[in-house]
């Protein structure tokens, strides 16, 4: 397995496909890729003012993560994974949890100001405080989110079933007729009690 936790954004849009192709090449058959990405919603609810989000993004690009340009809508990320040869198994939205994580980071940052100021300038401390506080706000109102994606290296049917058995043990172990009944319909195994 290979994991990438919020680093794909720093690869950049121009290098995203190449990055995913390299990960795919490094994985063994039936290998699993766990990727956590910061993302943006595709669209906004009618009347939602997203200028604040745009300003936050520009602030991040200039002062916090220069060149990190791949915080994208989830559909774009999924398409990139599929084009690189991955099969997406699961997508889990961590947005509400992540806003709480950001809040804890902000509180910790503020509580350690003296220690941080011994190493970094006051200007750097303030810049990161603004970034963390703004990130909490943007995440809470849905302007950004974090997704955890489980993807596997696509392969033959045998490989696919092995991957599924690893991710969901026992589900695919029954022979086809026992799972689907004669003629392909549901068997008694799955209809008892319904």
Spans of features found by a protein language model:
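Active-site glycine- and acidic-residue-rich loops that bind
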Residues: 10-17
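Alpha/beta-hydrolase-fold catalytic nucleophile elbow
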Residues: 36
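Short, cationic low-complexity segments
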Residues: 164-194
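Beta-sheet entry/capping signal
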Residues: 1, 30-33, 87-88, 148
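A short acidic, Gly/Pro-enriched loop at the edge of an enzyme's catalytic core
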Residues: 1-2, 143
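A short glycine-rich, Lys/Arg-flanked "PGG" loop and its adjoining helix->strand segment in the class I
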Residues: 17-32
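Substrate-binding/catalytic lobe of Class I Rossmann-like enzymes that use SAM or dcSAM, i.e.
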Residues: 39-159, 166
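A conserved beta-strand element that flanks and buttresses the S-adenosyl-L-methionine
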Residues: 3-8
């Amino acid at each position: 397995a290979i994991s990438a936790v919020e680093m794909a954004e720093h690869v950049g849009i121009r290098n995203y496909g190449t990055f995913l192709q390299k990960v795919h090449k490094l994985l063994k058959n039936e290998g699993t890729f766990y990727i956590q990405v910061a993302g943006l919603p595709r669209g906004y609810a009618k009347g939602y003012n997203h200028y604040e989000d745009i300003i936050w993004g520009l602030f991040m690009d200039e002062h916090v993560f220069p060149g990190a340009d791949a915080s994208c809508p989830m559909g774009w990320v999924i398409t990139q994974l599929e084009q690189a040869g991955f099969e997406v198994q699961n997508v889990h939205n961590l947005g509400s949890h992540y806003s709480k994580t950001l809040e804890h980071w902000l509180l910790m940052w503020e509580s350690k100001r003296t220690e941080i100021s011994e190493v970094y300038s006051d200007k750097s401390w303030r810049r990161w405080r603004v970034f963390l506080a703004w990130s909490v706000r943007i995440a809470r109102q849905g302007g950004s989110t974090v997704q955890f994606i489980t993807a596997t290296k696509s392969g033959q049917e045998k490989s696919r079933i092995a991957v599924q058995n690893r991710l969901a043990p026992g589900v695919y172990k029954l022979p086809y007729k026992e799972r689907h009944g004669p003629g392909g319909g549901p068997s008694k195994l799955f209809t008892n009690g319904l």
